[in-house]
Amino acid sequence: MIRSQPKGRSYDALLKEWQECLDLSPLEKVHFEGEIQALSEQIHRLENRHIRIAAFGRVGVGKSSLLNALFEKKVFATDIAHGFTREAKGIQWNHSIANLKSIELVDTPGISEIASHDRDCLALEVALHYDLVLLILDSDITSVEINALQILINNGKPVLLILNRCDQWEPNEIGKLVQSIKNRLPNIAKSIAIETISAAPRKAKIYSNGRIRSQECEPDVYSLKNILDYSETTFISCGVFL
């Protein structure tokens, strides 16, 4: 988390002071070079109000669809059956938010079809390189998602929980599901907000010949968009800016 800049001192000066205070052996410096560089880049981005938001979660929960809904057009490829994203891809979001110069929305690979160690490494990489993480669920939270959430929080990463595909349930069922997710969250995550959305809702359409087809409907991501529109207030409450 990035704290307010002390009066009269630049972020560059603070960053240099921090790097000089690191008590690392030559081997440790080589080993942690990537992490130190990532943190340095993040500090400079936040100083200039350039924010990177990552969509993160299991394969097929609708990460790409959510980002497309925020863009209001298809900019990320989707595959309904198995998920499509193989590597992180970021695109500038042309959406005006007060006090922010730019926002990059980033699609990340799914975490459910990779080995446990690699999955943990991916969660850590997301924690290091992005300023806010949207952890997307499409049902009750799983042990894989809880573990990834703990890694993100333990590394100081602000997280919003997003429950997608809410068009599939009745309102009372959504309420019960949200409560179940809250009950399963670890203590360090109890205060995290859970937003309910439908990134790519579909409904059955009956044709005159009796055939039934699935028809795409308008996305419902207004609650999430409204939260992001609060700009600095949202990012302060999440811990991006203090």
Language-model-derived ranges and their functions:
Residues 1-113:
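Conserved G1/Walker A P-loop phosphate-binding module
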Residues 116-140, 145-162:
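Inter-motif core of Ras-like GTPase G domains
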Residues 57, 137, 163, 198:
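Short beta-strand/turn micro-motifs composed of small residues
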Residues 54, 160, 193-195:
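A structural signal for isolated positions on well-ordered beta-strands in alpha/beta enzyme cores
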Residues 87, 101, 122, 126, ...:
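Helical mechanochemical/support elements of P-loop NTPase systems and associated helical scaffolds
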Residues 167-239:
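Canonical P-loop GTPase G-domain recognition
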Residues 112, 143, 169:
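Catalytic P-loop NTPase motifs of RecA-like helicase/translocase cores
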